[in-house]
């Protein structure tokens, strides 16, 4: 059955760009890869080869692809920043009816990259895994053209400026379009064998699920249809489409793990009913049909996971949780301990450590964005895998032996101390994670480059132009000017929160500084220039991380004091008597401002005097997004310093000026 369109609405809403995309889809050849894309393919091959060396049979095909910036519609809505990181095969390999509503120029580029990645995997004898959100939002113009397919509203209302909807998977037309997209995907990428889908988060969701962010909602037609029928029917459609295309696939649907304040996607009764309707090879929430056994397939690769010190790159350290809990994970780089999604990567690493057996064992190893971290993990696994199931003493001895291969036997204890201290720092930072604190603060809220001034609302549009468009802020300027309003989460708000935040930072920084001291000892004792350069770079990256810790502390403290002072509404004395001293709160704010200026200048010097990468930056300005810092960061840090220095006199409008 072909879709029927609402033609007047369609003609009114389709943009010229969409029209061009449709024409291009019919006539344009396969995309020609840029030199940047070619270099990224070479990086993918190096990582995939490394994964194979470690025993991988599968690698994620979707990790590290260029993001779909065309989905920032309208341009000032930050919410797409969450879902564009996970490629949607429905938009990349669309049925003909869908083509006019997606950017086919972008799509051809990504399809070409995926095909080339598959050729690499074919050459290496590896298979592919696909990770995405599903069912993902569609552009509003699509639903205007096909109103019968509009499913639930799935955006987070406090983080989006636009109501965003996914498709209703109960509609036969939706199932047909998804089946066609699946067949198209597997025709281009035949190496894919396994799928993991996140749902109920980041622009995805099913009708009438209790956990939908705007509240339970959906298409009226399916309100009374059992959830088990709807979810199982959709997933079985995808598996059947793959079979019709000549492929046997496995699917694992993963609802977001609810935090304390969130509802579960499916009730226990709903989950049981869904699982019993699934065939083998399909799982929901890690339970495979039809009997609910633990899913035996490959786990998800999490594109969001960046590591406790992100946006700093290259700070790879072993995961030492086994030292305290007896768990078997061995590497931490690239993993966010506060996130339940991290468990997928840990499982892949545990699989990678397992000794080879005569039977066929499938292993997936994630291709993390940071190549240096992945190489470190590989060396660690290869060096210590023999002790992975040994006693704590055995494992510590193996770790010390690995440290000797990294820094030399004389410096092995120094390096072991570095790892212990950074592991402690990482663990303490967990307390502040509502999502990785450094990522949420410095990237989503641009603490790293935005100024701390008493009256941020008075900054001009030109003053804010370098950071304001990249704040994850869907509300107004009042919220955008608040340093701790991070995507409508004010978890660090108030003086009490300031003290708790400060307590965590004051325990983390000494560990980081202690690790830096050990790194400098290792550097000074290094036997040659190459080794000295390696440890010098590690030290500079650690210095940059310490700068970000200080900035985070300053931002939270500054906003707490600023809110307190403004709420008191005490009018400054216009003519203070001789002998008037500086008030404690004025001294607090101005000292915080000066500390942050000096701290930012330190970070700027580090960036200016280091040729290698310290911070993850987009390669070109056009690829800076809410989720990634841009290559202009050094200039932006200078701009931050200049703006803060230009507003010293503003403090006299908040406080009585001292007159000693």
Segments predicted by a language model, with ranges:
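Bacterial N-terminal signal peptides
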Residues: 6-16
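Catalytic domains of carbohydrate-active enzymes that cleave complex glycans
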Residues: 386, 390-660
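Boundary at the C-terminal end of the N-terminal hydrophobic targeting segment
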Residues: 19-23
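Catalytic-core regions of glycoside hydrolase
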Residues: 28-157, 162-423, 447-448, 452, ...
